[in-house]
């Protein structure tokens, strides 16, 4: 596709197969003009437009006035390719030219319409009137330079637009965008362009070369919003995806038209419109019965755009011959569809007169009105029918009453698989699995002729997963009924815990016992009398809800699947739930998806028609989109609306579901993307609060981690970066304020400040920084990172815990008396040198022996060794373990483990008390009594229990009493947290728990004291 759109018009696209063209056409008409394809009769023709419409259109900045065109053509007269550089006009002159009244045009009226509605090729234009000779000569001078004839003046509009906005032509990226610059390919979006199809003249290229002689933009006009190519430069990808605000937003009055004036028409919206947002234009089209799609196809009637941005949609529309339509053209189409007031009044009077004429001729049949399922009969005369006819009416009345009392979700529940909306492939897989279940798992053991062995990959159960309301349970029931199976449903309202071990309770026990009896007893389904009792299938609904109330339910369900003799269908919403982590290994996984809005809209239209509701198709599609594919919820809304109205329009759906829309779960990353997106500034305050409070813990952390990567769209072109830094400072200050508020919430339980914290931590930074995300370092991925604070906080707590362990071990060794801070700042470096330097410089055996002795001296374990090394690592500094050979490391580990059996342990948490199977969750501190009181009691206890004590031990204890006093005094007087001894004191004789009595009175503490005295305060394990 050439970059010059006019070349497309100059190509000989003869659709008549070489037939002779009609005579009487001028040179201007020789171009192949797009003709409007056959459209429904409801679409009004856009060929002609009155003078008021054209005058109103000229107020848009995308169309130049007549005076500007004459000045441009006179300036370019006879210049050929070497056009002089135009001077920039002042803003006041632009406004004056735009606001000048248009002169009356008589001769060139048809061409005015062509200029105004360039996107809509008129079908009624046959022979346009030739312009005056002077104007023709002016246009001819430029046309001769290009070798073309009959071109419009829209290229001058483009030149004026470039002259008014010269800054948009710059860019420093090597983006091979689809820009129209010299050397570029395609059509970019960096410049505002006129709406005409013939706006790609060579003049704008020459103007661009004259204004921007430097080729910093690379291949193509790779400006700030330059094409969609490889924008690898500093500014080439800056504003990609940005949708600018309409230039005349809210300045035009939205017209009113006939209710269904756009019925049967399909629109595609492209670019930025003149006064409407894209969402507003979509709502306007759907309100009058039109359809809006996202891509161009053969069924598209119009491409709605106020400027030809030259994207994929524009090129596709030109290839398929889809006419272009401006916003003003859409307004005219709607406005002309509304009849005049006099016509409406006359039509209403005629309608009333017809009713009056027909009313006496009608018989008075029985009128049946439905109000909440009740029938009200009005009128006394009954049409002359037989008794049979009246009886049929009575029967019909009774049936209507019975069916009217049902909810629509039950009334229109699918009866056959073809009635299920969407997921037909999943229905087919479930049908095939159920049909072949008996052959695979019941008869597979029979080695008869022609019997297939069971497939090793086959599953005895199936797991249906998907959002609620899309037909999972209905699918299970319908398919089971179709195959002649009796579906036994067990949902979340039933007790589904672990079955009783005493299975003899059988069906007389709990629901779990009944299920176990059902799946394990073959006589229930496979007895001799099979015809009287149908085969069964167990439907376990909402298995992801088997939580605390159903203890052991999932494990018992897995055991039931293994031994089951009937098919089991499990249904859940979230197949990735942790509760189902083990269940998915035993089930065939079938993932149900949400049906499309077109599928749901078609089904809802059928139901509305059966219920006598007049509903628009786009209204039903909007309802399907608002409920996120939940057809059950859509039917409930539709039934509720049918009680108060008989016609459901698009606006009715929007008005009802704006306040009662279905909630959906969104991740914190999705919430941050919406807050910081280009449309984040258009969100209402309640929407921002909902997004921020979707996860009040993670959303602020993700925002704090990523807000500096966003370039705000509100700062515009900021070469110096001062505006962006100002916004960053304000956002950082708001986050700091939120941290102060969050401390009050978390520490002092001031939860009434939650909204203030939400405002400061999420809403204010997002309002300041929403825009395009960009990378700040080479190699960085351009997506939101997870909050780094959580990982750093966890690492900090782990390091503090490990340092506390090493601190307690060093204190217990009695080689140093220091606090944790001194250990980290002063001693850790010295300890690291003593542990690593010998391994680097000395021979292996000597180094290993020295390091092990040093570790024994300070009661350091291997975990402490790793802690000291890990805490001594710093970014940008070498690893302390560098230079140590792997053989030396393995020798050190081996030597330390060899001496562990005889190693002296001085820390209380390393003491292994005999008889204690596992450590207690809450250890009790041993009570160390004064020496003067504990020794007599201890000796007394030893003498009273002499049958269990050796006399030699008692003698040694008496001898070591003077040496036993010093360690006990040190332990009692030292208040350090690290040397608090924690033991599980138990008595061996009478089974009493010594935690309930003083440590000095127990036998265990007495023996502990003896051992401590014998080893000089050291205990051997």
Curated annotation (Swiss-Prot):
Residues 1-259, 339-392, 931-1021 are annotated as: Disordered. Induction: Down-regulated by sucrose starvation. Residues 90-110, 241-255, 347-357, 965-977 have a biased composition (Basic and acidic residues). One of its GO terms (biological process) is resolution of meiotic recombination intermediates. Residues 999-1010 have a biased composition (Low complexity). It comes from Oryza sativa subsp. japonica. This is Replication factor C subunit 1. May be involved in DNA replication and thus regulate cell proliferation. One of its GO terms (molecular function) is ATP binding. It is found in: Nucleus. It comes from the Eukaryota. The keyword Nucleotide-binding applies. PROSITE patterns: BRCT. Residues 123-138 have a biased composition (Basic residues). It holds the Pfam family AAA. One of its GO terms (cellular component) is nucleus. Residues 197-207, 945-958 have a biased composition (Acidic residues). Residues 257-347 form the BRCT domain. InterPro entries: AAA+_ATPase, ATPase_AAA_core, BRCT_dom, BRCT_dom_sf, DNA_pol3_clamp-load_cplx_C, DNA_replication_fac_RFC1_C, P-loop_NTPase, RFC1. Heterotetramer of subunits RFC2, RFC3, RFC4 and RFC5 that can form a complex with RFC1. Its main location: nucleus. Keywords: ATP-binding, DNA replication, Nucleotide-binding, Nucleus.
């Amino acid at each position: 596709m050439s970059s010059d759109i006019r070349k497309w018009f100059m190509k000989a696209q003869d659709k008549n197969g070489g037939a002779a063209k009609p005579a009487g056409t001028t040179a201007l008409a020789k171009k192949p003009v797009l003709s409007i394809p056959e459209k429904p009769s409801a679409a009004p023709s856009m060929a002609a437009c009155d003078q008021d419409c054209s005058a109103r259109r000229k107020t848009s900045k995308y169309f130049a006035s007549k005076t500007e065109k004459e000045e441009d053509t006179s300036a370019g007269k006879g210049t050929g390719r070497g056009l002089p550089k135009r001077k920039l006009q002042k803003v006041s002159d632009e406004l004056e030219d735009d606001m000048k009244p248009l002169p009356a045009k008589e001769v060139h009226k048809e061409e005015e319409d062509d200029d105004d509605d360039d996107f809509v090729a008129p079908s009624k234009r046959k022979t346009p009137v030739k312009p005056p000779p002077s104007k023709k000569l002016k246009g001819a001078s430029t046309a001769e330079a290009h070798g073309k004839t009959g071109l419009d003046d829209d290229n001058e509009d483009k030149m004026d637009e470039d002259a008014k906005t010269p800054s948009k032509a710059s860019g420093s990226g090597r983006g091979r965008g689809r820009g129209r610059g010299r050397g570029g390919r395609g059509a970019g979006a960096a410049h505002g362009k006129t709406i005409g199809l013939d706006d790609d003249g060579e003049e704008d290229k020459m103007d661009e070369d004259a204004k921007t002689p430097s080729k910093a933009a690379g291949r193509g006009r790779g400006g700030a919003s330059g094409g969609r190519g490889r924008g690898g430069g500093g500014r080439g990808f800056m504003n990609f995806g940005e949708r600018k605000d309409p230039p005349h937003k809210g300045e035009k009055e939205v017209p009113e038209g006939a209710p269904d004036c756009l019925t049967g028409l399909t629109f595609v919206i492209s670019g930025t419109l003149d006064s409407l947002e894209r969402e507003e234009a979509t709502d306007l089209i759907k309100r009058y019965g039109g359809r809006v799609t996202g891509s161009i196809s053969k069924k598209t009637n119009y491409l709605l755009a106020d400027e030809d941005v030259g994207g994929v949609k524009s090129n596709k529309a030109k290839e398929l011959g889809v006419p272009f339509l401006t916003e003003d053209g859409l307004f005219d189409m709607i406005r002309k569809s509304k009849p005049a007031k006099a016509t409406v009044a006359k039509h209403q009077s005629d309608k009333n007169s017809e009713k009056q004429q027909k009313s006496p001729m009608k018989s008075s049949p029985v009128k049946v009105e439905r109000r909440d399922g009740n029938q009200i009969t009005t009128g006394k005369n009954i049409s002359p029918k037989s008794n049979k006819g009246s009886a049929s009416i009575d029967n019909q009345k009774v049936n209507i009453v019975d069916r009217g009392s049902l909810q629509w979700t039950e009334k229109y529940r699918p009866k056959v698989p073809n009635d299920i909306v969407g997921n037909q492939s999943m229905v087919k897989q479930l049908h095939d699995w159920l049909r072949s279940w008996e052959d695979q798992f019941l008869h597979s053991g029979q080695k008869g002729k022609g019997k297939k062995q069971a497939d090793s990959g086959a599953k005895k159960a199936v797991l249906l997963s998907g959002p609620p309301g899309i037909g999972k349970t209905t699918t299970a029931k319908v398919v089971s009924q179709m195959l002649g199976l009796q579906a036994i449903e067990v949902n979340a309202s039933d007790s589904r815990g672990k079955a009783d071990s005493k299975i003899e309770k059988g069906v007389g026990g709990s629901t779990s016992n009944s299920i176990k009896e059902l799946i394990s007893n073959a006589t229930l389904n496979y007895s001799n009398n099979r015809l009287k009792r149908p085969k069964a299938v167990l439907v376990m609904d909402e298995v992801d809800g088997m939580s605390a109330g159903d203890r052991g339910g999932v494990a018992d369900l897995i055991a039931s699947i293994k031994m089951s003799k009937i098919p089991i269908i499990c249904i859940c919403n979230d197949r990735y739930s942790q509760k189902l982590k083990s269940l998915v290994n035993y089930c065939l996984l079938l993932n149900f998806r949400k049906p499309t809005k077109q599928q749901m809209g078609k089904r809802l239209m059928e139901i509305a028609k059966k219920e006598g509701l007049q509903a628009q198709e786009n209204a039903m599609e909007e309802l399907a989109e608002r409920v996120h594919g939940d057809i059950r919820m859509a039917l409930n809304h539709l039934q509720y609306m049918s009680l108060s109205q008989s016609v459901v329009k698009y606006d009715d759906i929007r008005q009802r579901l704006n306040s009662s829309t279905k909630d959906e779960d969104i991740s914190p990353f999705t919430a941050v993307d919406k807050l910081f997106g280009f449309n984040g500034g258009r969100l209402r305050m309640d929407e921002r609060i909902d997004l921020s409070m979707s996860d009040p813990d993670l959303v602020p952390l993700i925002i704090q981690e990523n807000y500096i990567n966003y370039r705000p769209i509100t700062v515009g072109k900021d070469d110096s970066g001062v505006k962006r830094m100002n916004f960053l400072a304000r956002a950082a200050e708001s986050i700091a304020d939120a941290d102060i508020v969050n401390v009050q919430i978390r520490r002092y339980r001031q939860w009434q400040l939650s909204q203030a914290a939400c405002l400061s931590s999420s809403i204010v930074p997002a309002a300041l920084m929403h825009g395009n995300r960009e990378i700040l370092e080479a190699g960085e991925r351009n997506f939101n990172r997870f909050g780094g604070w959580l990982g750093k906080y966890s690492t900090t707590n782990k390091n503090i815990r490990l340092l506390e362990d090493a601190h307690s071990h060093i204190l217990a060794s009695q080689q140093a008396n220091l606090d944790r801070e001194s250990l980290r700042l002063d001693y850790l470096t010295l300890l690291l040198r003593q542990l690593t330097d010998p391994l680097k410089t000395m021979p292996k055996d000597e180094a290993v022996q020295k390091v092990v002795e040093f570790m024994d001296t300070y009661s350091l374990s291997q975990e402490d060794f790793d802690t000291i090394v890990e805490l001594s690592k710093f970014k940008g500094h070498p690893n302390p373990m560098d230079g140590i050979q792997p053989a030396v490391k393995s020798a050190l580990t081996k030597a330390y483990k060899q001496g562990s059996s005889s190693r002296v342990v001085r820390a209380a948490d390393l003491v292994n008390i005999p008889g204690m199977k596992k450590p207690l969750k809450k250890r009790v501190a041993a009570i160390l009594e004064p020496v003067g009181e504990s020794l007599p009691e201890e000796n007394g206890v030893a003498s009273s229990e002499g049958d269990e004590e050796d006399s030699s031990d008692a003698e040694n204890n008496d001898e070591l009493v003077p040496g036993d006093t010093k360690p006990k005094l040190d332990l009692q007087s030292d208040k350090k947290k690290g040397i608090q001894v924690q033991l599980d004191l138990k008595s061996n004789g009478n089974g009493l728990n010594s935690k309930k009595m003083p440590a000095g009175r127990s036998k265990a503490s007495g023996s502990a004291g003896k051992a401590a005295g014998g080893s000089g305060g050291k205990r051997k394990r």
